[in-house]
């Protein structure tokens, strides 16, 4: 079939095959940077300045430029919220902060590999590459898929993809994460 070249490629080739460019540099060609504050979501204290809110993603911890803050010890900071209108990047300390967690999400623009399930079903879901399977219950609300996780999941990010598998690992479909919730909020 001539798929040898494709099958020997690495699993992930960066953002949609843009090649060996630096991500920020690539985006800067299309979206000019607008600097803004990096704010601790718990204290509302400004910790630093970001290089442009579109260059960051929820759950990101590297490249923030806010390490070594006096009085914060060895805290690792993670992006937990982006206010695009106000150009504020919010961060939280440490792994498994409640600001990074969710227990349900809604998926839009779903593509099914076969027939759409007719009722609620158990599924395994991946929210990012190389992530462990997340057992969830898949149901429907209008045209959207509603996923309720069996356990809390960290940094499920609107705009990214969720991919659903059955318990045997068979691909069912996937779509775009629209919004996430923790305990209904």
Residues covered by each model-derived region:
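Nucleotide-activated chemistry modules centered on ATP-dependent adenylation/adenylyltransferase
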Residues: 1-171, 175-184
């Amino acid at each position: 079939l001539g798929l040898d070249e494709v099958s020997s490629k690495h699993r992930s080739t960066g953002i949609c095959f843009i090649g060996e460019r630096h991500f920020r540099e690539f985006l800067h060609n299309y979206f000019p940077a607008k600097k803004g504050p990096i704010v601790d979501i718990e204290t509302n204290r400004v910790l630093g300045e970001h290089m442009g809110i579109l260059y960051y993603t929820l759950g990101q911890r590297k490249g923030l430029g806010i390490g070594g803050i006096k009085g914060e010890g060895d805290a690792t900071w993670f992006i937990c919220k982006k206010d695009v209108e106000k150009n504020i990047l919010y961060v939280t300390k440490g792994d498994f902060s409640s600001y990074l967690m969710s227990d349900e999400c809604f998926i839009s623009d779903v593509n099914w590999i076969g027939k759409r399930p007719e009722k609620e079903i158990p599924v395994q879901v991946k929210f990012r590459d190389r992530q462990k399977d997340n057992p969830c219950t898949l149901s429907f609300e209008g045209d959207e898929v509603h996923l309720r996780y069996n356990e809390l999941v960290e940094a499920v990010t609107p705009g990214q993809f969720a991919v659903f598998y059955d318990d045997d690992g068979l691909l069912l479909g996937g779509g775009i994460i629209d919004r996430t919730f923790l305990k209904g909020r």
